[in-house]
C-alpha cells in the first residue's frame, strides 16, 4: 500500500486493519464517485463497494468472488442508490496490449513492486498461494521463468 500513491491512488486501505467507510469519510468527507474492486476470492468486497459508493456512483468489478455468498451485500442498495455496476474482464489480447504499452511508458514504478519469481519446481505453490488455495501472502507480481532456480522476493531488479 505504501507504493499506491506512486500509481495515482488517492486512498488505499487495508480493509483487514481499517474500516474502509471510516477511512473514506476521514479522507474526503463523502462517498466515492467510483469504486474499483479488483479483489479475488473476497466475497465481502461487493457489499463494501456498494457501501462506499455515493448515490448515482459507479462500481467496477474486476475481481471474482469465488463464492455464491456475498456477506454484507443487499442488492436493494443498488436500486436505492441508483448505482451503475460494470464488470471488467481484463484478460484478452487488447488488455494485454494496453498493459504492455503502459509498462514501457515508465509512468509508474512497476519495478518497485514486490515480486516472486518461480521456476518449474516452485510454480504450483506460487499459483496456489495466488489463487487463495494455499496459505501465504500472494505477491503483487508473480513471474514464471522456466530457468529460475529459486524464489526471489522483494523489489524487481
What are these regions (language model features)?
Residues 1-3, 68-75:
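Short, glycine/polar-rich helix-capping loops at beta-to-alpha or helix-loop-helix junctions
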Residues 1-48:
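Adenosine-nucleotide cofactor-binding segment
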Residues 19, 42-43, 67-68, 92, ...:
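Glycine-rich nucleotide phosphate-binding loop and flanking beta-alpha elements
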Residues 39, 63-66, 88-91:
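Short strand-turn motif at the edge of the Rossmann-like AdoMet-binding core
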Residues 47-51, 92-157:
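C-terminal hydrophobic helical "lid"/dimerization subdomain
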Residues 53-55:
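Helix-to-beta-strand junctions that scaffold the AdoMet/dcAdoMet cofactor pocket
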Residues 58-60, 72-113:
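Rossmann-fold dehydrogenase core element
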Amino acid at each position: 500500500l505504501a507504493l499506491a500513491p506512486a500509481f495515482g491512488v488517492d486512498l488505499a486501505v487495508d480493509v483487514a486493519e481499517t474500516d474502509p467507510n471510516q477511512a473514506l469519510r476521514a479522507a474526503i468527507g463523502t462517498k466515492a464517485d467510483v469504486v474499483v474492486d479488483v479483489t479475488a476470492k473476497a466475497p465481502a468486497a461487493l457489499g463494501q463497494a456498494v457501501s462506499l459508493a455515493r448515490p448515482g456512483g459507479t462500481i467496477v468489478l474486476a475481481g471474482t468472488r469465488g463464492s455464491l455468498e456475498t456477506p454484507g451485500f443487499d442488492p436493494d442498495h443498488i436500486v436505492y442508490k441508483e448505482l451503475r455496476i460494470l464488470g471488467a474482464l481484463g484478460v484478452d489480447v487488447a488488455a494485454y496490449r494496453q498493459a504492455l504499452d503502459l509498462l514501457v511508458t515508465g509512468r509508474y514504478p512497476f519495478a518497485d513492486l514486490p515480486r516472486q519469481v518461480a521456476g518449474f519446481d516452485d510454480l504450483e505453490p506460487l499459483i496456489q498461494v495466488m489463487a487463495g488455495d494455499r496459505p501465504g501472502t500472494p505477491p503483487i507480481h508473480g513471474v514464471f521463468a522456466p530457468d529460475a532456480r529459486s524464489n526471489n522476493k522483494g523489489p524487481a531488479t
